[in-house]
Amino acid sequence: MAVLHLVVGCAVIALNLAAFASGGIAWYRDRPSVHFWYLLRAAQAAVFLQVMLGGLLVFTNHEPDDSLHYLYGILPLVVSLIAEGARAGAAERELGDVDFEALPADSQQSLALAIVRREMGIMAVSCGVILFLALRAAGTSTAF
């Protein structure tokens, strides 16, 4: 089980690095990226699986050398949930008091792209934070 936890941990690092880079580049270029959203969801699934495996290891009396490993292991899930909450409010913040249906089609499209860009930026930053936390978790594990 510890080996699986290590392998999934490496996947968490790789997937969040890829999502962070992909989302950051797409955000910078001001172009929506379908590829980013698939990477993001895979990274989030890996984080969830990693936390579950870590919980199983705790319940089977495996302990890391450093107790900070628990904090660095759980925080990525917390960051992911907070980022999803922030993403959910991105459309509301972008729209403000504007009546979307009353806007002309080209303005609707521009506003929709602005919402997607804001959501992508929020989630890309969260992947960067999770990447940092996962690297710290790896550094406090017994595997290294």
Name every feature range the model reports, one short phrase each:
Residues 132-144:
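Juxtamembrane boundary at the C-terminal end of a transmembrane helix
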Residues 42-58:
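A generic, lipid-embedded transmembrane alpha helix
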Residues 1-17:
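Hydrophobic transmembrane alpha-helical segments in integral membrane proteins
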Residues 94-114:
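Membrane-interfacial, low-structure loops and terminal tails that flank and connect transmembrane helices
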Residues 28-37:
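Membrane-interface helix-boundary motifs at transmembrane edges
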Residues 71, 111-129, 136:
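Individual transmembrane alpha-helices with interfacial aromatic-anchor signatures
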